[in-house]
Amino acid sequence: MKPLMWAAYVLAFGAAAWGLSHLRAGLRERAAEAAFPPSGQFVQVSTTRVHYVTKGEGPDVVLIHGMSGNLRDMTFSLVDRLAQDFRVTAFDRPGMGYTDRLHDAGETIVEQAALLSAATRALGLEKPILMGQSYGGSVALAWAVEFPETVSALVLTASPSHPWDGGMSRLYKVNSHPILGALAIPFEAAWVPSSYVQGVVETVFDPQDMPPGYDRHIGAPLTIRRTALKANALHRAGLLDQITELEPRYDKLSVM
C-alpha cells in the first residue's frame, strides 16, 4: 500500500504544481502583453488575424522576423531606415507576437508564406521585395517558390535554405513533443527568470554587443508565452524536412 500511497502523493503534487504553473504563466503573459501591446494594426485573412506595421512610401518591402521573435525585431531600427525610400510592412508570423496560429500542429513555412502573401494582397501591397531574417528567410524563400508572381525580389539574411547536418537542441525536442511539451511548457512560461531571457537575448549578438535599448524594445517576455513557446518549437522541429522538400524547386525561382 505504501508504494501506492507515495505514487498518489507524487501524482497529486505534480498535478498541483502543473496547475499552479498554468496560473502563474497566465499572470506573466498578461503582464507581458500589457507591457508590450500590439504596436501595429490587424488584417483579417479568412479566420486568421495577422498583426502588421506599415510605414513609409514607395516600392513595397515586406520584412519577416526569425525564430523566437516578432515584428518588434524589425521596428527597432530597420523599418524606420528603410521607410525613407520604401513602403515597409513587417508582419508577426503565426503564433508569434500577435498573429493567430493557423492550427496546433505547427505551421509549415509554406503555410506561413501563404498566409502572409494573402495578407499583402488584402493590404494592397504590390509585388513586394521580401526580406527574411533567419527562419523568416526560409518563409520568404517558400513564398518566392510557391507564389513567384507576387514577389519582385528576395533578400535572405542568415537564413536556412539547404539541408544541414545536426539535430535540434534538447529544449526544442521537449517543447515540440506532444506529451513532454504539454508538461514542460507551462513550467517554462511560469518560472523561467527574466534574467535568463535577458541573457539569451544578449548572446544572439555574440561576439558583438547588443545594441543599446534593443532588449527593452523587442518585448522578449512575449516569446515565453505558452502559445509562442509551442509554436516556436514546432516551427523549428519541422524546418529541416520542409527545406529538404523545398530545395529541388529552387531552379524554378524567377526573382532576383
Predicted regions: what they are:
Residues 1-60, 84-86, 125-126:
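Alpha/beta-hydrolase fold catalytic core
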Residues 45-47, 53-55, 90-131, 135, ...:
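Active-site loop/oxyanion-hole signature of alpha/beta-hydrolase fold enzymes
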Residues 48, 54-98:
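Conserved HGGG/HGGXW glycine-rich cap/lid loop of the alpha/beta-hydrolase fold
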Residues 80-83, 250-254:
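Short, conserved loop/helix-junction motifs that constitute active-site signature segments
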Residues 122, 126-169:
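Conserved hydrolase catalytic core segment
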